C-alpha cells in the first residue's frame, strides 16, 4: 500500500493484514441446496474459486475460474444446483450446512416481485414494495438485505437500499445513514460495493446519499428521528423522479437496538414505518417482536396496510464480538481513506489553522424523553429543542484520531439545517498542535478544506494509528 512521501501516511492496522497465507488449496464439493459457511479473521486471507457448477455469495453469483479474497469476513457460499470450489488460506472455522434459509429468501423475492409487477402495471402510479427488515443483533438482517438486493438487480430491477444502522456503514463509514440505488450486482469482496471516492472498480460505483448520525445507538441523542424523516423525504423524492427505482421500491436495513422495544412499544420502528410508508415489515429471529408488530399493524386501512412477515434466523448467523466489530469499523475507516485490496488510494495530508474549522459536536442526551409515542399525533422535527443538538467546539488534543463529517451546510446556518444536511465527505484529525494552533488533517482529496459546518460525533470511536 502506498505512502505519501515524507509523511508516512500508510494505514497502520491493529493487526497485520495480508499475513502470509498458506498456498495449499483444497477442493470442496457442494451438493444442491447446501452452503459453505466460513469465518476468517482480519489477519488472514481466504480465497475461493468456483471450478464448476454455479454458486452465489449473498445472492451475487460467483464468476467461474475467478479467485475471490476475503479478510475479516463471516459469510456463506450457497449453490442451488451443486458446485465445486477451490479453497485456499486459513479460516477460524468453516463447515458445510444442509439446512439453509435460501428457499425462504427466494419465496420472499418472488413475493416482492409481484408487488413490483403491480407497480409496473399501474404505470408507476403505485410505488413498489417498501420493505423494512428488523430483528435483534446478529440475526442476519444485513445478509438478508444483500440477498434481496442482489436478486432484484439480477431481474433487471433498480431497488433503493437504505442503511439506518450506525454500527456499520454502507458505502460510507460507521456512524452514518446512507441510501443508494442498485442497478448492478452487489460486489462480493467489498460488501456493498464502492463509491466514487474508492477509485476505479470493475463494478459500476454507487452514488450514495449520506447523513451523519454520529452516535452508537438510535436511542441516544436527539437526531435519529429527524434524520429518519429527512432520509425518507430524500428517498421518496428520488423515487418520484426515477420510474425504474419507484417500481423496484426500497429495502431498509436497521439497527438491532430498535427491536428491543419498551413494554411492547417500538417507537423507532413505528417512526420508520410511518415516515417511509413501509408496507412490508420483515422480522428476523424474534417471535416476540413478530407478535408485537403483528398486533400493532393488524386491521389497518387497506390503503395503509403493513404486511408483517416472520423469517427464521439462519443457522449461519453468528454472534460478532465487540472486538470483531471494532476491527470491522476501523477497517471501513481505513478503506475510506486508503482503498481496498489492489485499489489503493493516496489521501492528502493538510495543515490548517484552528479558525479554519467550524466544528459542531453532538450533545448526547435522552432522545426518548423528547419523543414519547403519545406526545404527538405525528412526528414533527420542528418540535425538537434545537439549542441542545450541537455545541460549537475549538480544536484540542482530545480531537486527535477522530473523524469530522463535512456537511453541505454553512457554519452560520441554524442547527436544524446543519443536522439535516447531507455529508460531502469525511476528514481525519491526525494531530493537534495547541501551541501553534494548527491541525493536521487527512483528506480523501487534495485542495483546501471546505469552510462548511463539520459535525463531530462519538461514533465511530477514535481510530488511532491511521497515520504515522
Curated annotation (Swiss-Prot):
It comes from the Eukaryota. One of its GO terms (cellular component) is nucleus. ATP binds at residues 35, 74, 138-143. Transmembrane segments: none annotated. Keywords: ATP-binding, mRNA processing, Nucleotide-binding, Nucleus. InterPro entries: Clp1 (IPR028606), Clp1/Grc3 (IPR045116), Clp1_C (IPR010655), Clp1_C_sf (IPR038238), Clp1_N (IPR032324), Clp1_N_sf (IPR038239), CLP1_P (IPR032319), P-loop_NTPase (IPR027417). Required for endonucleolytic cleavage during polyadenylation-dependent pre-mRNA 3'-end formation. It is found in: Nucleus. Belongs to the Clp1 family. Clp1 subfamily. The gene is CLP1. It comes from Phaeosphaeria nodorum (strain SN15 / ATCC MYA-4574 / FGSC 10173) (Glume blotch fungus). It holds the Pfam family CLP1_N. The keyword Nucleotide-binding applies. Component of a pre-mRNA cleavage factor complex. Interacts directly with PCF11. This is mRNA cleavage and polyadenylation factor CLP1.
